From Swiss-Prot:
GO terms for cellular component: cytosolic large ribosomal subunit. Coiled coil: none annotated. This is Large ribosomal subunit protein bL25. Part of the 50S ribosomal subunit; part of the 5S rRNA/L5/L18/L25 subcomplex. Contacts the 5S rRNA. Binds to the 5S rRNA independently of L5 and L18. The gene is rplY. The keyword RNA-binding applies. It comes from Yersinia enterocolitica serotype O:8 / biotype 1B (strain NCTC 13174 / 8081). GO terms for molecular function: 5S rRNA binding; structural constituent of ribosome. This is one of the proteins that binds to the 5S RNA in the ribosome where it forms part of the central protuberance. GO terms for biological process: translation. InterPro entries: Rbsml_bL25/Gln-tRNA_synth_N, Ribosomal_bL25/Gln-tRNA_synth, Ribosomal_bL25_short, Ribosomal_L25_dom, Ribosomal_uL5_bac-type. Belongs to the bacterial ribosomal protein bL25 family. Keywords: Ribonucleoprotein, Ribosomal protein, RNA-binding, rRNA-binding.
Length: 95
């Protein structure tokens, strides 16, 4: 089981996302289930390394730890930079 530490995002929009990426982080979102969608931020290098592990894209899911609360999710969509090896956004769906 892969566990990723995430933080809740307070600022949203293009400028806030660009500031995150400049700080070696990137935006993501968790949706689905009965709870409301949560905008989060992830550390780029940690997530990029975990992405290479088997099981990151499996339907068995990942565990996101947000403010000490564990949420079981699976990857729904990944957006990448056009020519750099960078993740720009990930959509997670609750399972």
């Amino acid at each position: 089981m892969i566990t990723i530490k995430a933080e809740v995002r307070n600022d949203q929009g293009k400028g806030a996302s660009r500031r995150l990426r400049a700080a070696n982080k990137f935006p993501a979102i968790i949706y689905g289930g009965s709870e409301a969608a949560i905008a989060i931020e992830l550390d780029h290098d940690t997530t990029k390394n975990l992405e290479l592990k088997p099981g990151f894209y499996d339907n068995t899911g990942l565990t996101l730890v947000i403010n000490g609360k564990e949420t079981k999710v699976k990857v729904q969509a990944v957006q990448r930079h056009a020519f750099k090896p960078k993740l720009t956004h990930i959509d997670f769906v609750r399972i």
